[in-house]
Amino acid sequence: MKRITKLLASHSLKSLMAKKNKRSQQKNKCLKPEKDPSTVKRLLEDPPRKKRYLQPLENPPTESYGDDEKMETEEEGEKYLGKNLPASAFIIVAAERHDSDSYSETELEKKICGSVVVAKMNDDKMVSTDTKKKYFQRILSDDDKIVLLQGMVDFQNDKGTISYDDMTGFIDTVKNIISFQANSRQFTTKIRRLKDKFVQKRNKGVDENSLANVEIYEI
């Protein structure tokens, strides 16, 4: 009998303790996390670590791309062709530099050299053409006009044909007695212009008594 009473008392005590713990847990759920005994215990055992924020990196100094590009272009131009290069050559080299990433170093060197050479040849050709035009436009003096017209008369008397029919033979006849050099096309153009100019002056009555105009008129 005593044993049964003891078991019942023990069972009642356990039931009371279980109910008490259950009430305590429900009460703790209503508390804020920092007031919850279980949360406080966990924080004491494993305190939170302070968060570290990465500092932003300073902006790296910007480089002047245009100045570097210009310096590299000038160095490459001097390296491959030396000095005294035309300005257009450096312009072409600068344009080619924008596609340098897609070429190997050897291919880029060949491409730059080719562009500079072509630009230099074009500039030289333009200068040479302008020089020839200016030279031939200013060489025909009054003495050359007289010699040229007299040579046409002599050639017709000696050969029995006019200079237009045998321009090559006429040039061979007068090339050593005039002060300029020209091909058959230039000779033909000069003779035609000389004729037109003389006819215009004669129609206007411009100084027909001068020595050169008299000799030209007589020829």
Swiss-Prot record:
Residues 31-48 have a biased composition (Basic and acidic residues). The keyword tRNA processing does not apply. The keyword Ligase does not apply. Residues 17-30 have a biased composition (Basic residues). Pfam families: GeBP-like_DBD (PF04504). InterPro entries: GEBP, GeBP-like_DBD. Keywords: Transcription, Transcription regulation. One of its GO terms (biological process) is regulation of DNA-templated transcription. Residues 65-77 have a biased composition (Acidic residues). Residues 9-77 are annotated as: Disordered. It comes from the Eukaryota. Belongs to the GeBP family. This is Probable transcription factor At1g55950.
